[in-house]
Amino acid sequence: MLAGACCKCPFSLSAFKRSLSVAPRGCGSASPPRSLLPGWRLGERGLQEAARARSAVRPASFYRHSAFFCLSCQESMSDSLRTCYVYLNQTSRSFAAVIQALDGELRHAVCIFYLVLRALDTVEDDMTIPLDKKVPMLNDFHTFLYQDEWCFTESQEKDRQVLNDFPTISLEFRNLAQEYRDVISDICHRMGVGMADFLEKKVGSMKEWDQYCHYVAGLVGIGLSQLFSASQLEDAEVGQDTKLANSMGLFLQKTNIIRDYLEDTQEGRAFWPKEAWSQFAGRLEDLAQPEKLESALSCLNLLITDALRHVPDVITYLSRLRNQSVFNFCAIPQVMAIATLSSCYNNPMVFKGVVKIRKGQAVTLMMEATNMRAVHTIISHHSEEILQKVSLTDPSRDKTLHILALIREKSTLSQSSFPSRTHHLSPMYLSAAMLLAALSWQYLSTTAAQAQGTSDMQGK
C-alpha cells in the first residue's frame, strides 16, 4: 500500500499508464455544518477521478500484513502506525496517496494530523450526539490526545473507527516529535472551539462565511504550513505567514461549498451566506427553481468571484515552497479548485446536479501540477475560461473582471522570477509515486474483497 510513497525504489511509469482506471465520486451524508478537511476532500475527489478505491471498511488487522509495504518500511513501522495508515486509506480514500507521497517524518505527522481532525470532524457530524454532550466534547477534544485510553464508541458515523480506536491514533500522536504535537494539539483546540460556536449558528454575512471557512479549512492550512516548517523541509516563513495559509484553506472550502449547493440544500444544510443569496431569493433553496435561474446564476457568480480573491495569495504561497513533495501536496488541490470554479461559473448545472471535473482533466492536472510554471499556466487557462463567460449584465461583472486582472498581474509578476526549488526527485517520478500509492490501495482493496468472498464461500 505504501510502496510508492514510503520508499524511493525505482518502478516503471508505463505500468501506471496501463493500469490507470477512472470512476465517478460518491455522495456524502447529511450533517450540519459541512465536514472539515475541505482541501483534502476537494483534491481527493479529483484524485478519485484518477483512481477510485471502492472497499468496505474492514478491521485494521485485515490489511496488516499487506505485501504492498516495502520491506524496509514494514520493519520500521510499529503495528499502531501501520493501523493509522490503514485508517488513513479508509477515511480519506484515494487522496491518502498524496499524503503518503510526502517526504520523511512529515508523512507520519500529516497522517496523524489528518486522523485527529477526522475524529474531531466525526464528532461534529454525528447528529445523534446531543448538543449538551457534543459541545464540551468539541471544546475539550485536544485534551483527549494525552489520555491513553480515551475513545468514543457511541458514534454511528461512517468514519467511527477513528473514534472507536482513538487510543491507537493518540498513541502515535504522542510518539511524534514535540514540535509536531504542539501544532496538532493547538489546531485541534482552535478548530473544536470554532465548530462548537457554529453548531447552532448559520452563516449570515460574508464576514461570517470567511470566519466559518477559517475554522473548518483555514486552520487546516495553517496547521499544515506549520508542520511543513517544523519538518525543516520548508522555510520558517511558510509556517509563520498565517494569512497566506488561511487563504489556501478558504479557497478550497469556498469551492466545495459553491459546488455542493444542490446536495447540501437537499439534505437540509445551508452554507451559502445569507448576505449573498438574500439579494436574489427569499429562501436559499428557491435558487434551484427553474424560474429563478437568472437570479441563481447571479448569486453563484458573486460567490465564485469572492472565492477567486484568494488566488493571488495561493500563487504567493506556492511560489515559496522548496520541497517537491510538499509542493505537489499543496498544488494539486488548488489547481483542482480553480478548474472546478471555472466549470461552475455561470453554469446552471450547479442547481440541477453535480458539476465535476472530467476524468481525463483530473489526471492531467495531477500529473502536470508539479512546478510553478505549470501551475501558472493552469491558473491562467482557467481564469481566461471564466473571463470568457462573464456576462455583460452580471451584477458582479466589475468585481469579477477586477479580480481576474489581479490574478493575471500576479501570475505575470511571479513568472518573471521563479525561485529555485530543490528537487529531491523528478516531478514525473513523484507524480507516479502518488499514482502508485493510489493504485496499490485499489489493487489491495480488490484482492482483499476477493479473499473475503472466498472465505465467506468456504464458511457456508
Pin down the residues of each PLM region.
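Hydrophobic alpha-helix feature that most strongly marks membrane-spanning transmembrane helices
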Residues: 308, 312-319, 342-349, 367, ...
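Membrane-proximal, acidic/low-complexity disordered segments on the non-cytosolic side
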Residues: 443-460
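Acidic catalytic motifs of isoprenoid enzymes
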Residues: 2-12, 16-315, 319, 381-389, ...
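Membrane-interface, cytosolic juxtamembrane amphipathic helix immediately N-terminal to a transmembrane helix
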Residues: 411-425
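Long, compositionally biased intrinsically disordered regions
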Residues: 404-411
